[in-house]
Amino acid sequence: MTKETFQVVSAYDGTKLDALCFLPEGKPKGIFQILHGMCEYKERYQPFMSFLAEHGYIAAAHDHRGHGNSVSDKSDLGYFSDKTGKAVTEDAFAVTQALKKRYGDLPIILFGHSMGSLVAMNYLQKHETAIEKLVICGMPKKNIFVGVGLFLNGVISLFKGERHRS
């Protein structure tokens, strides 16, 4: 098994996304693209990626913007973008395109964990023909207090700015 690292430049706004791949020995069966959860990073999935590569898959993961090595400065940690969550979904699609360009037109299996499962669901709605299969793991459940949290976040952002850490 071989490990490769590379960067993908986001088509959304030019953010550099740090990516890691584990390559199997021999001809790969497909590409298993991993979307990690909130406050995680790609290296956390290395044992799983190793397992996938041992079973014939290219295992790929990237750090979402604001996570791991996909930040230009420590102040970017935890910050997605000044717009919406659309950037994270489009980043995942840019990584898919880079993987296909790099390794050929192999079947893509998209795996999303926790927050990554929400990204994967958005991805499916916008780019359903780009993947062959979808695996959802640890999907968050509906929370009745989300509205309160969003309201409080908005109030705090008015006074302390969007990048304030609470």
Residues of each region from the PLM?
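Active-site glycine-rich loops that stabilize anionic/oxyanionic intermediates
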Residues: H36-E40
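Alpha/beta-hydrolase active-site loop
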Residues: F80-K100
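N-terminal cap/lid segment of alpha/beta-hydrolase-fold proteins
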Residues: M1-G26
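Conserved alpha/beta-hydrolase
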Residues: R44, M49-S75
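Alpha/beta-hydrolase-fold enzymes
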Residues: A120-S166
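Alpha/beta-hydrolase fold nucleophile elbow
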Residues: Y103-S114
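Glycine-rich nucleophile elbow surrounding the catalytic serine of serine-hydrolase chemistry
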Residues: G112-N122
